[in-house]
């Protein structure tokens, strides 16, 4: 029987930071989390700060350094994952690829090619390179999955693993009613597309043992959305902690017939 582990990239701030802390509190699974920082110990300390029984939790949290625009760092992190979680005894039960950045152009004249390229490198190619090096650690069809511990507050599926890529509602072409945000919209549309492609690959290779999805978290009170907090309607601006809890609930409840699609924090489908 294969033992589960969790991968969150990145985890040093925003939703990734809150999600890692949430999963440390609500599951007993080992977690591999990433940071761009050259001081992983500082990231680990931040993730554990003020958590109940932090000293007991600390051994199951490992930190790797990843810059998604530098494939060599992703490859090195994947090598470390294989050392910590050998494929003969372990499988990747939950992976969250959530790098993101935003340059909100209002019209074509504001498009800066260097910033647009950076947006695609982080938002679209970031999850893509994480998929390249980590998706093979998801369980194959023949693998018998060890159940989630019954005492865990968050019960991940015992029948399948899940790969999540962070998308956004503005990545929906069919829902594009306002225009603008050219590079960000296109980069997130790409995330929805590559999530579907990954799921098709997993369906052929892993059967129902591994699924992929894209996710829209709503507007979250992070540095990425800071300039737009005042324009969000009441009750729709989420703290990172609230967003993480909603995200975990959607992930834990995802069914096989929901695979390959983009879902939001209300567990409603976001059409491409």
Q: Predicted segments — roles?
A:
Residues 9, 88-102, 123, 165, ...:
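Rossmann-fold scaffold of SDR-type NAD(P)-dependent oxidoreductases
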Residues 100-102, 107-120, 125, 135-206:
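Catalytic loop of short-chain dehydrogenase/reductase
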